[in-house]
Design a protein with these regions (language model features):
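Conserved short acidic donor-positioning loop in nucleotide-sugar-dependent glycosyltransferases
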Residues: 17, 29, 44-45, 98
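A conserved acidic beta->alpha catalytic loop
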Residues: 43-52
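Short, acidic, metal-binding catalytic loop of nucleotide-sugar glycosyltransferases
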Residues: 27-36
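Catalytic metal- and UDP-sugar-binding loop of GT-A-like glycosyltransferases, i.e.
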Residues: 70, 96
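Acidic donor-binding/catalytic loop of UDP-sugar-dependent glycosyltransferases
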Residues: 49, 100-112
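Short aromatic/hydrophobic "clamp" motif used to bind/position activated sugar donors
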Residues: 93
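Cell-envelope/extracellular polymer assembly enzymes that use nucleotide-activated donors
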Residues: 7-10, 38
Length: 113
């Protein structure tokens, strides 16, 4: 698959009050051999600590990071992922959980035929 044929690549990262894991996850996205065009963090009602971490990492990121948050009313992961897909501008979407450390070629491997 050719990157140009795909258009924009969006990575959606779901999270809930796991700043330690989210930071590791996002830093591993920074080191991808093929960078996404945007990363959308779907936050299922985390505290302000998560928003602060995301704000700090937005300043360092080699791509836009968009923080999508909704109030904590129980586990609503599917609803949050749907909001993130609606917010994305990518033609190709990769969904991951916020506690995943990514291999540097994860996106490149997705693009292989």
């Amino acid at each position: 698959m050719n990157r140009k044929d795909l258009g924009k690549i969006s990575v959606i990262v779901s999270t809930y009050n796991r700043c330690d894991a989210l930071q590791v996850c996002l830093l591993s996205l920074f080191k991808q051999t093929v960078l996404p065009d945007e990363v959308i963090i779907g936050d299922d009602g985390s505290t302000e600590e998560t928003a602060s971490l995301i704000a700090r990492l937005q300043e360092q990121a080699p791509f836009p990071i968009i923080h999508v948050w909704h109030e904590d009313k129980g586990f609503r992961l599917a609803m949050m992922r749907n909001k993130c897909v609606a917010r994305s501008t990518g033609n190709y979407i990769i969904e991951i959980d916020g506690d995943v450390f990514l291999h540097p070629k994860l996106i490149a491997d997705h693009l292989r035929e």
